[in-house]
């Protein structure tokens, strides 16, 4: 009796652990752990690092334990991702934006480690590369929104990511027909003047100048990016800081891959963000916003990006949160050394449809079949699409697709970045370029990088960000609007410094007035949100302090959730000491309830019912609370649409659903049960069918021709038109002589 009891206790204990250490975050992440370090302490360290003067204070330290090991992060502000002309625009305005929340670092004492991310409201979000693989850290409420959590962030390993078919049907960025249409279109570009053959102008400069140009080219290894985000991307991440952090994370991820690749002698290829355009939710109805429409196909979305002039950039991308057809996560124009347009450094030109377009473009989405993909997936997608821009088609052949090899040793290493179909992401080759890709990319780099690549270097005064060695940064003379800071056109030693007698500059933060003084303690610097109070200046810094949280269990997210520690992360059920549950169809619930918020008593799954049911009428006053469109439903087997119907997620498409409907065993069981219960109806239907067929044969037989000559001819069908024949002239038969006359005459002869 003791042994079964012990086993039951062990199973219960294991099940309790599963809630935190075994449950997936979504269909792409199998395993995670929670992080609960002190966010207030990290926020204070972040503020101190921003104001740091001494070398030691410039570092941000973060220690925590997860996945059976200790992480001792030592990070410093990262300014290498933004060019000297960096701008952030939104709603037709240039913002004085500070990127001091972007950090790069390493694990203290672990050689070869690397970390990159952002610190927003005292929480680190990003990735950490270790000897044992890469870990990813994200806010917990991005995945878990239905209960109180003992942690604020989640951390998971790259091996625990289930990769979707991230490049669409048959594993491609789009199907073959789309690629073929794009290739043919790229051939129709019309070159303009000297731009058509820049190599001729280089050749005419003489051997001495050409040698100098090659020397200069050795350092021109940086591709400058223009990245736009549409209103849906902003809506998902919520703030400009979070959007900038996502862009920084993607650029840093591909920068790491390309910098460590030797493209036939061309090394240290890097990326810098030159300009960012953020379309906020207020731009959704702006007629000048080309991405304002909700239903845009992936090809049209790329075309809208290409219709803008991107001559000032190496590449121009748009990030969105759209669920494109066939699960496509990215699309880009493929570059070529010559013969067709498209790819890096491509200039705007006229094409066969009479439109001017820039084909140095691509698009990325973070949504796939109704779910948001992990950062690792979109990072690889970004690297793959940029690989197309750099001139690499999909890998093919035994040399460059080792994952298809019959040799187990080669197969174990997996396929490369430009492989046409989805990879597991955890193989040795998954984050590398194949020899085929390197050869193709090297040819394009040799031919085109002279046209737009720049020398790499640290960002300088004039980009609107207060960086190391700067007191302020209001931009260049045509951008600087405050009287507190010397603009970037001033002489060295003076530019990006506070003017004499000035306390601060608005470029340092929102708590500095236009009169160059700190705002008083009572002035607001941040609007309140569902779960956080408005930000109030402290009177001694230009930065806006962190907002105080609103009381726990305050309604948020349209009364579907409650606030927990300043985050809209709890279920509305918790407000009434209940637990949220799923109204799944397997529980015999009405299909209409699948998109309702459902609650149950703690530890009593049998009490699970909709908030609009009689069972919970006292708590919710008969009010039915519905899930937000896009929320998972039916035990994560589908998602709610805008009509509050649970749509099952089926990656196989409508044909597979039709096949399941026709060949479902349940269908035939139901038919058999009905026949047994209503045998008399089946008998009547059989007799009626026989009589119908007999009558049909009897009626139609009199009109059917027969080869039997003894049967009467067929009757014409009623309403049949008869063809009239024209009257024929009556011919007289020839006269014949009487037989006697004939014989007599014959006899006379």
From Swiss-Prot:
Annotated compartments: Cell membrane; Golgi apparatus membrane; Cytoplasmic vesicle, Clathrin-coated vesicle; Cell projection, Axon
Q: Which InterPro entries match?
A: ADAM10_ADAM17, ADAM10_Cys-rich, ADAM_Metalloproteinase, Disintegrin_dom, Disintegrin_dom_sf, MetalloPept_cat_dom_sf, Peptidase_M12B
**Residues annotated as site: Cleavage:** 214-215
- Residue window of motif SH3-binding: 709-716, 723-729
Note on how the cofactor is bound: Binds 1 zinc ion per subunit.
Residues cleaved off as propeptide: 20-214
**Pfam families referenced in this protein's UniProt entry, alphabetically:** ADAM10_Cys-rich, Disintegrin, Reprolysin_2
List the disulfide bonds in this chain. 223-314, 345-452, 400-436, 461-496, 472-485, 474-480, 484-516, 504-512, 511-537, 525-544, 531-563, 556-568, 573-599, 581-608, 583-598, 595-640, 633-646
Q: Which residues form the Disintegrin domain?
A: 458-552
Q: What is this protein called?
A: Disintegrin and metalloproteinase domain-containing protein 10
Task: Please name the source species.
Answer: Mus musculus (Mouse)
